[in-house]
């Protein structure tokens, strides 16, 4: 189920990630969801891919996700 807006993201994503990271998550999830239509674990795969996309740009420091240094 693709997400149109960040407010539709799972609570664990919304409550922990900054707005920009939520955008990355949503866009990566939607793209992966569309790309894995034949996969019976489509939604699970899309969530894994979305978290991977976030982790390429952000790192968790303590309780907060912060953008990686260039």
Annotate each PLM feature:
Residues 1-70:
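C-terminal alpha-helical interaction appendages
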């Amino acid at each position: 189920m693709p997400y149109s807006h960040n407010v539709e993201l799972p609570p664990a994503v919304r409550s922990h990630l900054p707005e920009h990271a939520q955008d990355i998550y949503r866009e990566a999830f939607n793209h992966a969801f569309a790309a894995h239509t034949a996969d019976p674990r489509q939604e699970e795969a899309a969530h894994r891919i979305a978290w991977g996309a976030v982790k390429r740009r952000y790192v968790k420091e303590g309780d907060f996700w912060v953008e990686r240094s260039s």
